[in-house]
Amino acid sequence: MADYLISGGTSYVPDDGLTAQQLFNCGDGLTYNDFLILPGYIDFTADQVDLTSALTKKITLKTPLVSSPMDTVTEAGMAIAMALTGGIGFIHHNCTPEFQANEVRKVKKYEQGFITDPVVLSPKDRVRDVFEAKARHGFCGIPITDTGRMGSRLVGIISSRDIDFLKEEEHDRFLEEIMTKREDLVVAPAGVTLKEANEILQRSKKGKLPIVNESDELVAIIARTDLKKNRDYPLASKDTKKQLLCGAAIGTHEDDKYRLDLLALAGVDVVVLDSSQGNSIFQINMIKYIKEKYPNLQVIGGNVVTAAQAKNLIDAGVDALRVGMGSGSICITQEVLACGRPQATAVYKVSEYARRFGVPVIADGGIQNVGHIAKALALGASTVMMGSLLAATTEAPGEYFFSDGIRLKKYRGMGSLDAMDKHLSSQNRYFSEADKIKVAQGVSGAVQDKGSIHKFVPYLIAGIQHSCQDIGAKSLTQVRAMMYSGELKFEKRTSSAQVEGGVHGLHSYEKRLF
């Protein structure tokens, strides 16, 4: 035996790695690339990992992924896709209040259980009214009541099959001439459970199931398409009415109170106060205003990067905190204003403080890959907000274009001059609305096509689950418990270690992630 080898038992295991407290109390500002998590013991499969996380004090998601309120990232299409895959999207506010509220309404109407406020027409309405409703709402399975309003007697229903082959000159016909009459409809009585109603809908093979009371008055309706969505997207984020969850961004100015009212009417579940520096009297006053006027509406404050900033917003009553300043791929706040903080340090410091008050943290910015998501969650964040990682997906706003044979979509920071020129809301976010000379805190660029959210997000989910498996944790709750107890260990990486951890030593390679 070589003289340096020692024989004996395996009971001795040296202390290895650093605790999170040791890692982040060294005085250096760290980014996600500056450290690694040391692996643990595996006794379960990756698909057993539970990714359930708190977005706010009262909203829980099955997937810890959130899309950023940027005008090149999140409108209704993105918010719907994120909610269906278990996360949530925040509609940007670099637009008119009416446009933003309508985007929220599209999300809330996309999937429902009992629809208690459907589009309703009367027998004397015309075929062209159905086509207008279809263009406005995206569907045409419309119940017909004697007065054209909910709560009145059901007399029929109009579906696409009734109008598909009508000629232009027939668009002035009355609906009573072509609708499916009441006696031919399958209906369910008021008081039926959602499960029972879905079973009736399945057996009937109809597209819509009207719910009527003893007087045959319409009280609700259920759609077959929603039943199929419920089957296809088991992780979907929904409210108590079985509608998809949706968030929206607002500012902290007086005119944002009007925007807030429209969003509340549209059914928004949570608002994020969109500011690059959230520790301001303006945001504190807005938090108090919202909590007083809409006590059940969840409010996310931010952005913050220190415990001192977080304290003021927690005292004001926020339900969650958004953490990050200058770490986004299109953000130049740190470069231009010399303010901010490396993102990993910011997430750990704020999360460690906010957890004492039961306030979840959203890690916002600096996410370049699935490993960064796993690190943010391991440092105490409950969810991760993504901008560039979701930009250029099919569901992101904007049109694709080609450059040098590569398919791209535009992506810009909300602090870029490009975004500020589009709408005043971007200037408000950076306190620049009154400035004669605008100081850009972001840039405009382009991002390569990533395909659909419905393929990309499942890849992210699987990556997080495999990361938790390597750590030896069956849930994100366990990951954070291990981190705070000191059981989870970290290690700093030198620049050479970072090179070693990436692809190296190859003449050429193709990097396919999924």
UniProtKB/Swiss-Prot annotation:
It comes from Rattus norvegicus (Rat). Residues 114-173, 179-237 form the CBS domain. InterPro entries: Aldolase_TIM, CBS_dom, IMP_DH, IMP_DH/GMP_Rdtase_CS, IMP_DH_GMPRt. There is a cross-link at residues 195, 208, 438 (Glycyl lysine isopeptide (Lys-Gly) (interchain with G-Cter in SUMO2)). GO terms for biological process: 'de novo' XMP biosynthetic process; cellular response to interleukin-4; circadian rhythm; GMP biosynthetic process; GTP biosynthetic process; lymphocyte proliferation; purine nucleotide biosynthetic process; retina development in camera-type eye. Keywords: Acetylation, CBS domain, Cytoplasm, GMP biosynthesis, Isopeptide bond, Metal-binding, NAD, Nucleus, Oxidoreductase, Phosphoprotein, Potassium, Purine biosynthesis, Repeat, Ubl conjugation. It comes from the Eukaryota. Pathway: Purine metabolism; XMP biosynthesis via de novo pathway; XMP from IMP: step 1/1. The active site is at 331 (thioimidate intermediate), 429 (proton acceptor). Mycophenolic acid (MPA) is a non-competitive inhibitor that prevents formation of the closed enzyme conformation by binding to the same site as the amobile flap. In contrast, mizoribine monophosphate (MZP) is a competitive inhibitor that induces the closed conformation. MPA is a potent inhibitor of mammalian IMPDHs but a poor inhibitor of the bacterial enzymes. MZP is a more potent inhibitor of bacterial IMPDH. It catalyses: IMP + NAD(+) + H2O = XMP + NADH + H(+). K(+) binds at residues 326, 328, 331, 500-502. Its EC number is 1.1.1.205. Acetylated by CLOCK in a circadian manner. The gene is Impdh2. The modification Phosphoserine is found at residues 122, 160, 416. The modification N6-acetyllysine is found at residue 511. Catalyzes the conversion of inosine 5'-phosphate (IMP) to xanthosine 5'-phosphate (XMP), the first committed and rate-limiting step in the de novo synthesis of guanine nucleotides, and therefore plays an important role in the regulation of cell growth. Could also have a single-stranded nucleic acid-binding activity and could play a role in RNA and/or DNA metabolism. It may also have a role in the development of malignancy and the growth progression of some tumors. This is Inosine-5'-monophosphate dehydrogenase 2.
